[in-house]
């Protein structure tokens, strides 16, 4: 059920907010022992939120835009009075004394909090297997990963445990799991949505965005969470357009660029390539013009990212020293030993690996060769995008080179895991908005996602193209049943 449909049913009294909330909590009780999408379920809070909506409706009050909409929140967004762990032992008992800007805006808009979702530890991963509290499974095939790092949010939406969810995207952490789980995942322009209250991984790359079952709902959520925030100096102080009204704008004259370098990748699965190109042809049939474009440095994005992101992470995670908050190791006889032991015991192996990479890249004698060089390449990647947008409105690529892989398949091969974000990372480096939406299925019945990328602050155009494709292709109405969780 779409948010607009729910809103109508609520106003007509066909379903109450409490009834919908109880339905979602019952669904979670049935499927989450298998999926493990949630770390914490806030049932009492959810019922209280829903009751307030029903009481307001009974009193004749006008309802906010997300009244009674049951949501899940990735557990790296601070929620006041509710545990926020980042799926790490380091923050296992951390309860924030404040609310993140995005969640605050959701509650003001009437949304109902169902709980906090699992993720790769500190959002570092592409499979949700590095969580200190256990992996999440893919609803389409529980032997496979849901993607990452926002795998819990993607799986929860795909399995019908919530109507929508929030995630964060540093190098593809919304779009890649959206592709793997067959849902819509939107990464807004860097600075379009406040990061205040998002536990930082890589501050120049992180962005908050929604997971939904359809494009219109993504527009609804973005409408609520977008906008300037004086508490976040990187948040853009620009007007927020009406994203929902943009959906129905005609497609005639829209130019869509197919990035040559994306379709020439050696690791691109043949079924993924064929399905995404078919999606491009569908857009052409709707009135769009297809143009082949080149972004010569697109493939350099992954090497660039794995210098910049770990460097920023090594600085951001230095605050976890066992002194003020977070995990503190016992038995150390000196401050330095306590800090070292706290980090060794509190951080998982992938987080430690990235901290070490970042520390090395920033060290004396290597900073020029690695970090500064990576920033120069980042600028060149952005310039490639600038050149492409001189001739097209939207760029089209596969979201991921493959469909969801088996759990444990890349456990001993970090490089193979990193390559899962090969096609999503460049949009983060350039700060561009991008969306993944389902475009078909492989021979195993697993979802395939198509990625659309627009220029800075062109979310309206992005959502317009995605919406027209979704309405015409109607992909999810024809999905195979396969091993999808009951």
Swiss-Prot record:
Query: Mind telling me which GO cellular component terms the entry cites?
Result: glutamyl-tRNA(Gln) amidotransferase complex
The answer to whether UniProt assigns keyword Endoplasmic reticulum to this entry is no
Question: Which residues does UniProt call coiled coil?
Answer: none
Q: What is its EC number?
A: 6.3.5.7
Disulfide connectivity for this sequence is none
- Which keywords does this Swiss-Prot/TrEMBL entry list? ATP-binding, Ligase, Nucleotide-binding, Protein biosynthesis
Keyword Cell membrane included in the entry's annotation: no
Please cite one Gene Ontology biological process associated with this protein: translation
Q: Which chemical reaction does it catalyze? A: L-glutamyl-tRNA(Gln) + L-glutamine + ATP + H2O = L-glutaminyl-tRNA(Gln) + L-glutamate + ADP + phosphate + H(+)
Active site at 74 (charge relay system), 149 (charge relay system), 173 (acyl-ester intermediate)
NCBIfam families annotated for this entry?
gatA
The Swiss-Prot or TrEMBL record describes its family as follows:
Belongs to the amidase family. GatA subfamily.
Q: What does this protein do?
A: Allows the formation of correctly charged Gln-tRNA(Gln) through the transamidation of misacylated Glu-tRNA(Gln) in organisms which lack glutaminyl-tRNA synthetase. The reaction takes place in the presence of glutamine and ATP through an activated gamma-phospho-Glu-tRNA(Gln).
Q: What is this protein called?
A: Glutamyl-tRNA(Gln) amidotransferase subunit A
The upper taxonomy is:
Bacteria, Bacillati, Cyanobacteriota, Cyanophyceae, Synechococcales
The primary gene name is gatA
């Amino acid at each position: 059920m779409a948010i607009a449909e729910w809103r109508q049913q609520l106003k007509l009294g066909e379903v109450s907010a409490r009834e919908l909330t109880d339905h979602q909590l019952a669904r979670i009780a049935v499927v989450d022992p298998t999926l493990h999408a949630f770390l914490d379920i806030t049932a009492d809070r959810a019922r209280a939120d829903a009751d307030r909506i029903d009481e307001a409706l009974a009193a004749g009050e006008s309802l906010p835009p997300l009244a009674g909409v049951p949501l899940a929140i990735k557990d790296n967004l601070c929620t006041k009075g509710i545990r926020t762990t980042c799926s790490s032992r380091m923050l296992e008992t951390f309860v924030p004394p404040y609310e993140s800007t995005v969640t605050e805006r959701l509650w003001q808009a009437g949304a109902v909090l169902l709980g906090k979702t699992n993720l790769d530890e500190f959002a570092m991963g592409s499979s949700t297997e590095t969580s200190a509290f256990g992996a999440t499974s893919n609803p389409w095939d529980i032997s496979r990963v849901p993607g990452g790092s926002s795998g819990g949010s993607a799986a929860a939406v795909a399995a019908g445990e919530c109507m929508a969810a929030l995630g964060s995207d540093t190098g593809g952490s919304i779009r890649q799991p959206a592709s793997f789980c067959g849902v819509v995942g939107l990464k807004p322009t860097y600075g379009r949505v406040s990061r205040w209250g998002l536990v930082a991984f890589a501050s120049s790359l992180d962005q908050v965005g929604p997971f939904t079952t359809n494009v219109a709902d993504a527009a609804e959520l973005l409408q609520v969470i977008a906008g300037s925030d004086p508490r976040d100096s990187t948040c853009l102080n620009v007007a927020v357009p009406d994203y929902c009204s943009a959906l129905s704008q005609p497609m005639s004259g829209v130019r869509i660029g197919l990035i040559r370098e994306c379709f020439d990748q050696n690791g691109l699965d043949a079924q993924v390539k064929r399905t995404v190109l078919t999606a491009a042809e569908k857009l052409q049939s709707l009135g769009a013009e297809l143009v082949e474009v080149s972004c010569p440095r697109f493939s350099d994005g992954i090497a660039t990212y794995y210098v910049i992101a770990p460097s920023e992470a090594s600085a951001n995670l230095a605050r976890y020293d066992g002194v003020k908050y977070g995990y503190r190791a016992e038995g150390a006889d000196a401050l330095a030993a306590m800090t070292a032991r706290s980090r060794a015991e509190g951080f998982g192996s992938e987080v430690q690996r990235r901290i070490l990479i970042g520390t090395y890249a920033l060290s004396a004698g290597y900073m020029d060769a690695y970090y500064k060089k990576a920033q120069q390449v980042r600028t060149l990647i952005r310039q490639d995008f600038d050149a492409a947008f001189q001739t097209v409105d939207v760029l089209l690529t596969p979201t991921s080179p493959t469909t969801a892989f088996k759990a444990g398949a890349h456990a001993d091969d970090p490089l193979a895991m990193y390559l899962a974000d090969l096609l999503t990372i460049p949009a983060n480096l350039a700060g561009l908005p991008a969306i993944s939406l389902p475009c078909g299925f492989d021979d195993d019945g697993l979802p395939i996602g198509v990625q659309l990328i627009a220029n800075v602050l062109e979310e309206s155009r992005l959502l317009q193209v995605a919406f027209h494709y979704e309405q015409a292709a109607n992909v999810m109405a024809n999905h195979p049943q396969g091993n999808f969780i009951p």
